[in-house]
């Protein structure tokens, strides 16, 4: 029965637009991810990025933000800090914070890319030289991907409109989608967190300040070149 459901789900996913199908798969994966598996992926990213950027001037460090994983609802509030560090000086050049959904996207991107780079380096005698030229700025390239993931907030419902409304649970939506939903519901469409009071209703995120983002659990990272202060 389980396999049948899985096959049916795959058939449905095959008919969806690629972007929507990818979103559905990421949501399903984050929903089934255990805490131990999550920690394992954080450790794996540290190992993989260290191997690919071996011999390079900069490297990335991934770590769970202290205290963000202590809640029973850790999947909603957990944050992963990604830091770019200069190996020779030890200076933190950039730091950004990701939620679980963003981290899973980055995990898939990096592990997929790294597998190709490492496979190439193991099958070609000239790979060291070629790989060095390609990955000399690998940490910076990956940090750019982190910035892209944390900067581009899309509506969690339609995956098309830009998210301009944020709930206290950190899920974000476009005005059109959330207006339709809130006509009949008083909870988050994604995690079902109840909005109990009028002042807990949909929060406009127009030109948010750093304090605003912290208050709504966005936890966006510091701008490039500024160290993260936990």
From Swiss-Prot:
GO biological process: protein autoubiquitination; regulation of DNA-templated transcription
Alphabetic keyword roster: Lipoprotein, Membrane, Metal-binding, Myristate, Zinc, Zinc-finger
SMART domains: RING
Compartments, as annotated in UniProt: Membrane
Species whose genome carries this gene: Bos taurus
Entry superkingdom: Eukaryota
Pfam families in UniProt: zf-RING_2
Entry's Gene Ontology cellular component terms: membrane
Zinc finger (RING-type): 155-192
Membrane topology: Lipid-anchor
N-myristoyl glycine lipid sites: 2
InterPro entries: RING-HC_RNF141, RNF141-like, Znf_RING, Znf_RING/FYVE/PHD, Znf_RING_CS
Job of this protein: May be involved in spermatogenesis.
GO molecular function terms listed in the Swiss-Prot or TrEMBL record: ubiquitin-protein transferase activity; zinc ion binding
Name of the protein in question: RING finger protein 141
């Amino acid at each position: 029965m389980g396999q049948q459901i899985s096959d049916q789900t795959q058939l449905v996913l095959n008919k969806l637009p690629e972007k929507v199908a990818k979103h559905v798969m990421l949501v399903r994966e984050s929903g089934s991810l255990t805490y131990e598996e999550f920690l394992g992926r954080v450790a794996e990213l540290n190992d993989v990025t260290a191997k690919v950027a071996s011999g390079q001037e900069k490297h990335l460090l991934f770590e769970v933000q202290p205290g963000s994983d202590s809640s029973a609802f850790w999947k909603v509030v957990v944050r992963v800090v990604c830091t770019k560090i200069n190996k020779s000086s030890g200076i933190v050049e950039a730091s950004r914070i990701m939620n679980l959904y963003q981290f899973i996207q980055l995990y898939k991107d990096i592990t997929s890319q790294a597998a190709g780079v490492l496979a190439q380096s193991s099958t070609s005698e000239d790979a060291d030289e070629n790989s060095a030229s390609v990955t000399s700025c690998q940490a910076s390239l990956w940090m750019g991907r982190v910035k892209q993931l944390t900067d581009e907030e899309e509506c969690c419902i339609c995956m098309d409109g830009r998210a301009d409304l944020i709930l206290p649970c950190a899920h974000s939506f476009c005005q059109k989608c959330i207006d339709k939903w809130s006509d009949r519901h008083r909870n988050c469409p994604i995690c079902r967190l109840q909005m109990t009071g009028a002042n807990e209703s949909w929060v406009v995120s127009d030109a948010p300040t750093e304090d605003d983002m912290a208050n709504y659990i966005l936890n966006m990272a510091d701008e490039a070149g500024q160290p993260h202060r936990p």
